[in-house]
Amino acid sequence: MTQEEKIERFHEIVNEMANLYAKKNANYGDSFSKLYNDLGPMAGLVPLHNKLDRLTNLIKGNHNDFESVEDTIRDLACYSVMFLIELENSSNDKGENN
């Protein structure tokens, strides 16, 4: 795969993740933001920690029928972006610049 093809694929993956994020928020509400607002920045670490544990188990060969390495990596990426958005919102609410 060329560098140009990798960049194109990167954009495709990010767009797929954004669409899934929008659909889940439409169906379930913005539970991550609610949790973050209730518990603060430490709440953002919980789903990342859980997904890293799952990824570790999957890579070690503890597979199951409904989770994949690829899906777990996408989940980690989505939660990371969601965490970043909440951090930015918190900083903006406090008048801070990051």
Which sequence ranges carry the predicted segments?
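Intrinsically disordered, low-complexity regulatory regions
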Residues: M1-N98
